[in-house]
Amino acid sequence: RRQRQMCIRDRYNNGAAYRFETSLKQPKVIINTETIEQNWTEGCKLYWPREKNQEYLTHCEAIFDELNISSLTKDMKGYLPIYLSTPKGTKVVIMESDLFDYPNLFLTGDRNNTLSGEFPPVVLKSALKEGTDRDEVLLEKASYIAETEGTRAFPWRVLMINEDDKAVIENNLVYQLASPSVTQDTEWIKPGKISWDWWSTLNVYGVDFKAGVNTDTYKYFIDFASKYGIEYILLDEGWSAGTWNIKEAIPELNIPELVRYGKERNVGLVLWTLWNPLDKDLEGILDIYEKWGIKGIKVDFMQRSDQYMVNFYERVGKAAMDRKLLVDFHGSFKPSGLQKRYPNVMTFEGVLGLEHDKDSRDINPVHDLILPFTRMVAGPMDYTPGAVNNATAEDFYINFVHPISLGTRAHQAALYVVYESSLQMLADSPSNYYKAPEFASFISRIPVAYTHLRA
């Protein structure tokens, strides 16, 4: 058979993109690297999410630093998306789309207005870091970035080109270029709000039971969700017998009873899992959740961007879809079209979100204002807004157990209008929302699914 390699270029009203397609005799090929160089004009300004981990072990939760392109050096890795403003005012977002069976793209600079591509290598061997149940050490890495099919299309390299910042928010080129859905059976997929337990550390009060990870507390969450028309509640870390034993709940939790109780009130349950144990028995674990009547999973702490991890995301999307389960990828890289191919994939974190108000001052209104023009351009973003208690910069303090947000309550409400996520969290305690009924009523009524996007 004739061997072919082609470069496909496309131009759109909202940008330009290219990808490679191969038709090779070998069923499997090794990709040593992919060369990407972008030469930009002097004076371009960037919002640069600098990745300091040189092994690409990252949650993709950086601050977007405002830099001149000429200040970038080889050791300053940045992950996508990257926002660039030219001296003439054109706004460009650098992204990729249709990322499957291939590592994520990172960029570096050279102090000469050139951006160059880098990729995480194939991970041959890894292990858990001593003393942790989730952080990995990469023990052996290949000299290549992928082993893949000889006949295939590679990811799109995308420049989203916009006349102004308004057009940046409306640009959906990444979604346009992504592969179509693998299924037409989507009626069961229900976007919605989700009441979250972790941010508030289950601090409910004024109740006649002991608050904690137990059936009564989650019934309280279900009652709150039902009252405000919130479709789901999330049982985050702590519900299972162990972080690596995610096939059974702790004795204090009666999952079948919670599913029954929620079903009567039109509230579904979503369960948190670490990625590692899920990876080791994906089908078996999801079979259990399907049998229990669970509506979705939040998969957490992937922290990698290599080929194996990209394939893990797709495996989860497919296995969950086969069992009519929704998926929220937390501790993740950015979306690049997976949610189009598997429409049960509802949202991705890959952002420095509200959860870090528990340990940092970096999550402030300026940071939040940058996100719609940077991270959110890639796709749905699990920022987890909804703080009831708020403070200005002068009065803000860090409190992990009783967290507050930096900014106003009106700012928190506005995030529900601006931020896109098909599973949009209400991060705070139901008890706090009951004390702020106007706020709870307003944010719970803002839709999460749209037919058109306007800025």
How does the language model describe each region?
Residues 3-8, 452-455:
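Short, small-residue-biased leader/transition segments that mark boundaries at the very start
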Residues 236-408:
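Aromatic- and carboxylate-enriched substrate-binding clefts and catalytic-loop regions
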Residues 24, 38-264:
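Conserved structural scaffold segments of CAZyme catalytic domains across common CAZy folds
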Residues 3, 228-230, 292-293:
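Short loop/turn motifs at secondary-structure junctions
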Residues 402, 411-427:
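Catalytic domains of carbohydrate-active enzymes that cleave complex glycans
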Residues 428-454:
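Glycan-recognition and catalytic regions of carbohydrate-active enzymes
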Residues 18-22:
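Short, well-ordered beta-strand segments enriched in hydrophobic/aromatic residues
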